[in-house]
Amino acid sequence: MKRIALFLITNLAVMAVLGITASLLGFNRYYAATGLDLGALLGFAMVMGFGGAFISLLMSKPMAKWSTGAVVINDSPEPMHRWLVDTVARFSKRAGIEMPEVALYEGEPNAFATGAFKNSALVAVSTGLLQSMSRDEVEAVIGHEVAHVANGDMVTMTLIQGVMNTFVVFLSRAIGYFIDRVVLKNDREGPGIGYMVTTVVLDLLLGLVAAMIVAWFSRQREFRADAGAAQLMGSRVPMQRALARLGGIDPGELPQSVATMGINGRPSGIMALFSSHPPIEDRIRALQQSA
């Protein structure tokens, strides 16, 4: 269930490239030198914010395959592969979406769904998941991922990320201009040191606030996908068992390079604010309390 983390990492990379390109083309100097047209700045911020988010969305499926080494198994004759494909097909039909690509990758117990459109998505399962869970538990995890696709969560998170990106780009530059021109009284043509330092600092600080907001929305989508899996299965019990089993897996077993993307991490303290997934205990409790 790595799709949000993969999306956010790609989005940050795209935003960084767009930001560097804008600086090289002189956009920052233009806004600081022309009295800062707020309407023009807002338009620029929206292009930067939503551009980065939607480019990340379009790149999400190939990036996920590349980063995990996932192999598509839709046409594989292997019995286990056929069972996985048939399970995804059955749940997709119930959810009213087109059949996604189904992939398998080597790794710790995990799964993810991604793709720019719900009718051309990818559902991937790790070998570790197949080895550590019973079939009904694996089905519950697959149902969870199909529910993400059916709910349009990738597009929803893209829109939220785009709004947050726009917020960060606009406010950091508007405040940077105010500090540079009004507080430090820079009257030279082009941005001064106050603008540049303030913009960089606020990009970081506001980016942290934006990340917490995006993570909060992501956690709500996880609860909804859990409920969707229970509905597709016709029972809450398999999803509860799958979550309980994941909760017993030591997060330290995951490689450091992908530890932040695992479903079974247990962030605590302030780091919980940046987690894309709620605590396992909360997810089980929500399923138990659902009608």
UniProtKB/Swiss-Prot annotation:
Source organism, top-level taxon: Bacteria
Binding positions for Zn(2+) per the UniProt entry: 144, 148, 222
Active-site annotation: 145
Alphabetical UniProt keywords: Cell inner membrane, Cell membrane, Hydrolase, Membrane, Metal-binding, Metalloprotease, Protease, Transmembrane, Transmembrane helix, Zinc
Membrane topology per record: Multi-pass membrane protein
Protein localization: Cell inner membrane
Keyword Ion transport: no
GO CC aspect terms: plasma membrane
E.C. numbers: 3.4.24.-
Cofactor note: Binds 1 zinc ion per subunit.
GO MF: metalloendopeptidase activity; zinc ion binding
A biological process from GO: proteolysis
Main location: membrane
Cofactor(s) required, per the database record: Zn(2+)
Keyword Membrane: yes
CDD domains the record matches: M48B_HtpX_like
Segments crossing the lipid bilayer: 4-24, 38-58, 159-179, 197-217
Family named by the database record: Belongs to the peptidase M48B family.
Protein name in the entry: Protease HtpX homolog
Source organism (scientific name): Leptothrix cholodnii (strain ATCC 51168 / LMG 8142 / SP-6) (Leptothrix discophora (strain SP-6))
